[in-house]
């Protein structure tokens, strides 16, 4: 499992020295770019809208419902804008502003209208979305029989109910209590009779007492109606509820419930629901925004006028399906890491030649390293994935994005290492030759300005990167074909990619050892202070390569990756040359590669024995590293 706080520290140590490139100095501006974009969009006379019905204030929306809205945002046509339709309001009034719009709009990729629309103002073609949303109490006309928890949709659809479905055990009990006659219940909204039906699929009711039968919306509910007349009635629409009818349903309300992506009831006490609100009962947008205030030091300076959690972080948290503050911290780390990757290009704009598609750009020969090919292969795989349309595909898509971002962060660390190693030659170019940095630029600018995944999870940062990099955008004929050729099937390419995967493992473990040495604490209540780099003087990293399989270029690259002195040896006896230092951690990377972290300690410090479990692990790694391969 990725430790995003460790990767955040790795990124923080490699950020630009100038404040103009620092995360906190730019995040408020990046988020606020939403406002002029919205203003510009709503000036259009022929703007198309995505109308989203909502029963209540957007600021108080449940995070599950907001996730559904964001899924619509992901899949809506690019030129559309979003407008909220309030189904709980009927009185006509002047334009009603969305409460805390300036904190909510940055969570959307599409422009979000500042003003809500009343349901009564919509034309007849508009139909609110049908979802199971609550539990209500229903009773017989004489009040003798009651069902305390019946699954029910949005209140506005109550007039469409044609009966109550119950399990066999409940049906038999009610029959017995009513002297053998099938009881008739009453719709709380309009007092119309609701016949009782026995449901064969008891899973749709779960632990509750029953479910409203709505054949107009749920095809499966039509099987309860057998005569031709009754079948015909199921296809006839009923009027949507008036305000008074909805108030009656509100009085009968017995709790909240949700609908899953298949439209089936989703229970709040189910295990999968519990994990989504782990780490605190964060179930509404209001609660998430309020809880995020305690973390404002992470993304803002004291001088910032707006210290609200950036919309990209809130959006990614909700789309992660883990509605916790712990997850919000992780999404902050990812946002920070992506921004710092972007600054590699931003800080070196003067070294990038601009070749637009209209220029007569020369035909360059491209030269790619295996770490270039590896990250490009990961990028191509992410681009080939389908855009998520439901919760299940969203979870899988988000997992892939996180994995790709981890790889991209490793690639950026390798790039920075390469820039330190070849600090002069990396920028050298001429009329027929691309510099090494221009090769890197072609990859990074493509990923940062064209990635579907980055746009989905970090839309504000994505648009900012596009705008900022546009003046120096390199568009070279043959670039894509050239880099694609390095990842095509074939033994040589496959071998290169395996080699790159090995480099990734080495680099990641090196970075984790680096964090173990510096050990800065991830704080949310005050600015994070980095420890001095001179601390690394007391440490050494030894990489045991028994087969001598790590290429020399990899060794040099890894040595420049960190301030910690790093050695490569092919025999364990060579490690003993550093016997004046004491091993404090070790990691087995594969059967022939091991990494050791040494610290210079006095004899008194070493006397404390290691915990028994750590000794066992150390012994296993020791045996494996000493094992002779035949």
Curated annotation (Swiss-Prot):
Domain of life: Eukaryota
Main location: mitochondrion
Record keywords: Mitochondrion, mRNA processing, mRNA splicing
GO biological process: Group I intron splicing; mitochondrial mRNA processing
Annotated signal peptide: none
Compartments (UniProt record): Mitochondrion
Record bears the keyword Mitochondrion: yes
UniProt-listed InterPro entries: Cbp2
Cellular compartments per GO CC: mitochondrion
GO molecular function, a single term: RNA binding
Function in brief: Appears to be specifically required for the splicing of the terminal intron (bI5) of the cytochrome b pre-mRNA. Can also stimulates the splicing of the omega intron of the precursor of large ribosomal RNA.
Note: Present with 1360 molecules/cell in log phase SD medium.
Name of the protein: Cytochrome B pre-mRNA-processing protein 2
Species per Swiss-Prot/TrEMBL record: Saccharomyces cerevisiae (strain ATCC 204508 / S288c)
